[in-house]
Amino acid sequence: MTNIRKTHPLMKIINNSFIDLPAPSNISAWWNFGSLLGICLILQILTGLFLAMHYTSDTTTAFSSVTHICRDVNYGWIIRYLHANGASMFFICLYMHVGRGLYYGSYTFTETWNIGIILLFTVMATAFMGYVLPWGQMSFWGATVITNLLSAIPYVGTDLVQWIWGGFSVDKATLTRFFAFHFILPFVVLALAAVHLLFLHETGSNNPSGITSDSDKIPFHPYYTIKDILGALLLILVLTLLVLFSPDLLGDPDNYIPANPLSTPPHIKPEWYFLFAYAILRSIPNKLGGVLALVLSILILAIVPLLHTSKQRGMMFRPISQCLFWLLVADLLTLTWIGGQPVEHPYITIGQLASILYFMILLVLMPIASIIENNILKW
């Protein structure tokens, strides 16, 4: 008799995706982040659901409802901080996952890569709207500044902003709709993640060497289930340490001040995971130019497969490209630091240089390095 997991309509799908899936025998810990992102997403949906049971999306009570969750609800504080710091872990895993894709040339799976970019945008939108919900100073002013950027769009900009706001400023209507979208989008992300996996399983996983691994596959279970559990335990360890020892480490103290439309905080800045894009936005003096640069800083990932000029897939055997990749990582860390600094003399220039370098590496230097490496192979 055939095993039920291979015949049952539902079990069959799970079996082909997570149990009998043929996987390359040499994938490293950099391939753990997909499953970690799945864990993060489930954690965020569950903690978010319990928070939504006690949260009220009204400007007069939103701030106090979050305080009520932390003070009066049983284990409300841990749910709230798991959700807030879970978002940080989510983005750490996301950026590692994208970095892995860039380094090992996984972007040659174009469909999977493009769905991944859509996923990235959706998660960023979800996180942004979630940051508005506690209705603190940074929530309110962050929402005001970022939504206001759409007014840079010629002709329809102002109408578009007022349509999103539901009025002439960020107010009750804005908060209510942001809560509605923040609730629904994680399920959209879940559906997109399923499509992401669907496309990935059409081709099979990439591997560090970048060459086909069809001749050397091993079953996903038990080899990679065990490996993924190790990654998951490390993720949970880091998250637990964050939540229990320094839950506000990655947050902004200004968000403990209730939103006040009449007083602007000295430094308006988003959560740490958006700072690199925020730095790119601020480095261009023109409003529309800044908005375009902001969108392109992520959308540029869609152009990466078109600029792949190397004869090799990954960067494992390409030293020049490796140097450029790590320069890109350092550049992104610099941009993240600049995004959190005030708009003053040394920071403005550093931000502009780092922004130029970011686009230069991806659009110009990487393709040139690949051509040079191709020629080195001939010698």
Curated annotation (Swiss-Prot):
Keywords: Electron transport, Heme, Iron, Membrane, Metal-binding, Mitochondrion, Mitochondrion inner membrane, Respiratory chain, Transmembrane, Transmembrane helix, Transport, Ubiquinone
Keyword Transport set for record: yes
Subcellular localization(s) per the UniProt record: Mitochondrion inner membrane
Molecular functions per Gene Ontology: metal ion binding; ubiquinol-cytochrome-c reductase activity
Superkingdom of this protein's organism: Eukaryota
Annotated positions binding heme b b562: H83, H182
Chain residues that bind heme b b566: H97, H196
Entry note: cofactor: Binds 2 heme b groups non-covalently.
Complexes and interactors: The cytochrome bc1 complex contains 11 subunits: 3 respiratory subunits (MT-CYB, CYC1 and UQCRFS1), 2 core proteins (UQCRC1 and UQCRC2) and 6 low-molecular weight proteins (UQCRH/QCR6, UQCRB/QCR7, UQCRQ/QCR8, UQCR10/QCR9, UQCR11/QCR10 and a cleavage product of UQCRFS1). This cytochrome bc1 complex then forms a dimer.
Function: Component of the ubiquinol-cytochrome c reductase complex (complex III or cytochrome b-c1 complex) that is part of the mitochondrial respiratory chain. The b-c1 complex mediates electron transfer from ubiquinol to cytochrome c. Contributes to the generation of a proton gradient across the mitochondrial membrane that is then used for ATP synthesis.
UniProt similarity note: Belongs to the cytochrome b family.
Protein name: Cytochrome b
Gene: MT-CYB
